[in-house]
A protein has these predicted regions:
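N-terminal secretory targeting modules
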Residues: 1-42, 49, 53, 57-60, ...
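Extracellular/periplasmic catalytic domains that process cell-envelope and extracellular macromolecules
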Residues: 34-37, 58-59, 86-87, 125, ...
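Conserved beta-strand elements of the Class I
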Residues: 42-44, 65
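Oxyanion-hole/transition-state-stabilizing segment in secreted/luminal serine hydrolases
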Residues: 49-63, 76-112, 132, 136-140
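Acidic-and-aromatic substrate-binding clefts and catalytic sites of carbohydrate-active enzymes
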Residues: 71-75
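Charged helix-capping and loop-helix junction motifs
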Residues: 108-118, 148-153
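A short helix->loop->beta-strand "cap" motif at the edges of active sites that frequently abuts
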Residues: 126-130
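Catalytic His-Asp segment of secreted/periplasmic serine-dependent ester chemistry enzymes
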Residues: 140-215
Length: 215
């Protein structure tokens, strides 16, 4: 009985610590059938990547693949680094993390520190790979986080400016009207995630970057 209880406890603990394990396993199963080639552009991050329905069409000819998972955080991207980054040996890594982190109470300073850890691991395990941080974007649901998002984006920009092969993409300012108000018609019903119109803007920012820097 004690062994059974211990097994159940360990199983529950592992599940609790790895809330997106099922998604990661699904990607690994997909990879076992068709593994992405080395040297591609990897997109890893939270639901802004995961819910990008037109990703394949929007990145056609750009040698890219998407491994967005859950509503992940940068800490979770670090946790799955070996399986979801190093295993692919990409030439570019596009990251969208930070937004959920701020909402869960992680400070911009701590997220920036985690970004530097991610950068260091990338340099060690995938030598020569370039790293692109996609700015935390605004939303109606998280309007109160605007200042923290801007703080985080500025911190990452400062880090990237000092590191070779590091870049940022402004995914914050494009969602505002000329009068400074946040666009109202680019979100789905939850007022957080982007709708089709929102993803047109989202995709354009990334497409423009790739054409200018990563072709």
């Amino acid at each position: 009985m004690n062994k059974i209880l211990l097994f159940l406890f360990l199983s529950f603990s592992a599940f609790a610590q790895n809330r997106f394990e099922k998604e990661i396993l699904a990607y690994e199963k997909q990879d076992s059938i068709a593994m992405p080639a080395k040297g591609m552009k990897l997109f890893i991050g939270s639901s802004s990547f995961r819910l990008w329905k037109n990703f394949d069409a929007d990145t056609k000819g750009m040698n890219a693949f998407n491994r967005g998972f859950g509503g992940s955080t940068l800490k979770e991207a670090l946790y799955y680094f070996d399986r979801m980054v190093a295993s692919y040996q990409p030439s570019w890594v596009f990251m969208y993390e930070g937004d959920n982190d701020l909402t869960s109470g992680t400070s911009p300073e701590e997220i920036a520190s985690q970004f530097e850890e991610f950068s260091a691991r990338l340099a060690k395990q995938v030598p020569g790979a370039k790293l692109v941080f996609v700015y935390a974007r605004p939303s109606l649901d998280r309007a109160a986080n605007k200042a923290k998002q801007q703080d985080l984006n500025q911190r990452i920009t400062a880090i990237a400016a000092k590191k070779k092969g590091h870049f940022v993409i402004d995914m914050h300012s494009p969602f505002y009207n000329p009068d400074g108000t946040l666009m109202q018609d680019i979100f789905v019903a939850d007022r957080l995630h982007l709708n089709e119109k929102g993803y047109v803007i989202f995709a354009k920012q990334i497409q423009n970057f790739i054409r200018q820097h990563a072709q």
